[in-house]
Amino acid sequence: VAAGDRPEGLVSILRTERLDFGYPRFPVGRGVDLEIRPGEVLCLLGPNGCGKTTLFKTILGLIPRQGGRILLDAEDLARLDRRTIARRMAYVPQAHAAVFPYSVRDMVLMGRTVHRGLFSSPGQDDRARAEAALAQMGIATLAERDYTRISGGQRQLALIARALAQDAGLVVMDEPTASLDFGNQVLVLKEVRRLAAAGLGVVLSTHNPDHAFACASRVHLLADGATRAAGVPREVLTPEVLTRTYGVPVAVEQLANGQPVCVPEDLSG
């Protein structure tokens, strides 16, 4: 269901209820309740190995849940076919180098595949939506460039544009700022906020609590496969919670504009 085509009165795009995730002989997480609404950014936060990637694979329908329910537009995810899921939920992986030297335009056009079939040629509407997505991400001038020859930040914007061209109501981003320099991290986080302002639901994972303070409507903190805290970032990401989660003393300070930031209390060793 695209952002503008949602049934009236439908509040959640995606909701999990007491979700257990992992593998039959290797449980990873248990009892996780998430909810993503239109116009919100939900930040999935936690240290390495806490289960964020496995949870994302489960939400995307790539691996079966081990217990509980996943509801996508109020429908059980397990009852939806892959194409229906892809039309409703777009996935933005970490920036990567493509195996083949596709142009940026062709990379974005791949987002239209779920609407026309794998071997069908893109039509006029597909091309128009791809061009609109390129323009929205501010990378229209890169359309003819080789995707493998642009910067990491530009690749990430191209992947976000591909998700926009997919015309889904929910965008799932797996550590969208990983391996990016500071400037490109800021650029991507700004685009995340713009997507939410346009009415899309966004869920992203990160290791960095400052990203939650910068762009998230709500945060879900995972540790050891279980929910450690959930709610508004300013309310739940306290020094005590962060110190307990990351195992180092953390202070939360405020910038001149009032935005909280995390700082280590002691780097002296």
Question: What positions do the PLM features span?
Answer:
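The feature captures the beta-strand-to-loop junction immediately N-terminal to the Walker
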Residues: 45-47
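Helix-to-loop junction immediately C-terminal to a conserved catalytic motif
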Residues: 60
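Conserved ABC ATPase signature
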Residues: 146-150, 154
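Catalytic Walker B motif of ABC-type/P-loop ATPase nucleotide-binding domains
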Residues: 171-175
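ABC ATPase nucleotide-binding domains
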Residues: 245-269
